């Protein structure tokens, strides 16, 4: 029944948007407000679903066209269903729905001189995604022919793992993410670095279980993410490799610590990303880099320390040594970013003029980044 409610509500929203855009008395802000209310009303009362809803509501503020809002909502529906899918076909359809929405948004939001680069990166992502998804779909059909069932329970799950790792941008399947990070608009970059990762890890925790070790992908992601950032001329490319390194740490949490620690560090990562790509204050940007580097007293330090502590508890010493080495290695280019932005001239007054929503978001995320260690330090002292 909820599927019919979603489809009917989305059709009404499309109709309202198409009619309102022709009316000079109805602005895009009204449509955005209705989209946000609709998201809250349709979301089930579960923690991960509500977190994805709140994140999408925040991300809607960065998009300034009705078409972009519509595709963002379609991607949200795909993510919401994928998080609770227990069937191979439903997982495939929902996952590809959000992929197609991202590709279309790359074309819609491309502006200026970076248009060709954005379209090229989107096409690379689409073709690589189609290749991986096609191979997975062939495997799904082979499983159905052999077992007569499409349920995930009792099936061999290697191709599901491979598709998920590709969508997360895990090394060595990461080149599409570097191209996209360097060419797409900032609003879409903020979406791509947060919402899909939350939905994929939630699906991993709630609907899907595997017997494969991801230790090889952890090592690839951490080493490529920490080494590949050196020599990058663009800041976006640097943070693309930083994201690959962070994904390696999140996989290390899955491998050694469990999903509670995963959600803890993923929440810190999302808050930091919301700050990074919404800032015009350069010194606050530098503080976000401090948290990403894992330096105390910010939340990023305690998130990484909690993962390392669990890795030591389960005696995964090889992964722990690699993670510590890559963290120290990545600290060098984070310090370059900190030096660059902390010593730059600050224009605080211009940073917050005429953007009340952005100011509220920045303030809330900055408070969370600073005071989250108060909660994260409890396991170490109790």
Curated annotation (Swiss-Prot):
Top-level division of the source organism's lineage: Eukaryota
Cellular localisation: Mitochondrion inner membrane
Coiled coil residues, start to end: none
PANTHER family, per database record: NADH DEHYDROGENASE
Family: Belongs to the complex I subunit 2 family.
Record's catalysed reaction(s): a ubiquinone + NADH + 5 H(+)(in) = a ubiquinol + NAD(+) + 4 H(+)(out)
Keywords: Electron transport, Membrane, Mitochondrion, Mitochondrion inner membrane, NAD, Respiratory chain, Translocase, Transmembrane, Transmembrane helix, Transport, Ubiquinone
Name recorded for this polypeptide: NADH-ubiquinone oxidoreductase chain 2
EC number assigned by the record: 7.1.1.2
Predominant place of localization: mitochondrion
GO molecular function, one term: NADH dehydrogenase (ubiquinone) activity
GO cellular component, as recorded: mitochondrial inner membrane
Function: Core subunit of the mitochondrial membrane respiratory chain NADH dehydrogenase (Complex I) that is believed to belong to the minimal assembly required for catalysis. Complex I functions in the transfer of electrons from NADH to the respiratory chain. The immediate electron acceptor for the enzyme is believed to be ubiquinone.
TM helices/strands, residue ranges: 1-21, 33-53, 54-74, 88-108, 123-143, 158-178, 188-208, 212-232, 239-259, 260-280, 284-304, 305-325
Top EC class, one word: translocase
Membrane topology field: Multi-pass membrane protein
Pfam family, one: Proton_antipo_M
Keyword Transmembrane in annotation: yes
């Amino acid at each position: 029944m909820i599927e019919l409610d979603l489809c009917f509500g989305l059709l009404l929203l499309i109709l309202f948007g198409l009619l309102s855009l022709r009316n000079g008395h109805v602005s895009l802000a009204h449509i955005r407000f209705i989209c946000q209310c609709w998201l809250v009303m349709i979301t089930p009362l579960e923690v991960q679903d509500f977190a994805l809803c709140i994140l999408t509501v925040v991300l809607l503020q960065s998009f300034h066209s009705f078409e972009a809002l519509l595709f963002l909502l379609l991607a949200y529906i795909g993510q919401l269903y994928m998080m609770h899918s227990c069937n191979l076909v439903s997982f495939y359809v929902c996952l590809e729905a959000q992929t197609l929405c991202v590709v279309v948004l790359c074309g819609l939001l491309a502006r200026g001189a970076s248009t060709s680069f954005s379209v090229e990166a989107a096409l690379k992502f689409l073709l690589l995604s189609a290749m991986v998804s096609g191979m997975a779909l062939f495997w799904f059909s082979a499983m159905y022919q052999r077992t007569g069932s499409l349920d995930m329970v009792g099936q061999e799950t290697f191709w599901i793992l491979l598709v998920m790792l590709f969508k997360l941008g895990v090394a060595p399947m990461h080149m599409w993410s570097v191209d996209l990070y360097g060419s797409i608009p900032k609003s879409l970059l903020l979406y791509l670095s947060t919402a899909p990762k939350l939905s994929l890890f939630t699906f991993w925790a709630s609907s899907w279980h595997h017997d494969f070790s991801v230790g090889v992908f952890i090592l690839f992601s951490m080493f490529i993410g920490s080494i590949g950032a050196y020599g990058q001329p663009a800041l976006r490319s640097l943070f693309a490799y930083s994201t690959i390194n962070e994904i390696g740490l999140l996989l290390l949490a899955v491998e050694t610590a469990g999903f509670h620690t995963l959600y803890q560090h993923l929440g810190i990562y999302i808050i930091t990303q919301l700050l990074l790509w919404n800032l015009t204050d350069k010194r606050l940007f530098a503080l976000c880099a401090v948290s990403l580097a894992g330096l105390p007293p910010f939340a990023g330090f305690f998130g990484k320390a909690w993962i390392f502590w669990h890795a030591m508890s389960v005696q995964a010493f090889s992964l722990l040594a690699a993670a510590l080495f890559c963290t120290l290695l990545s600290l060098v280019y984070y310090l370059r970013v900190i030096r660059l932005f902390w010593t730059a001239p600050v224009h605080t007054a211009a940073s917050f003029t005429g953007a009340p929503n952005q100011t509220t978001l920045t303030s809330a995320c900055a408070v969370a980044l600073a005071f989250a260690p108060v909660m994260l330090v409890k396991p170490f002292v109790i």
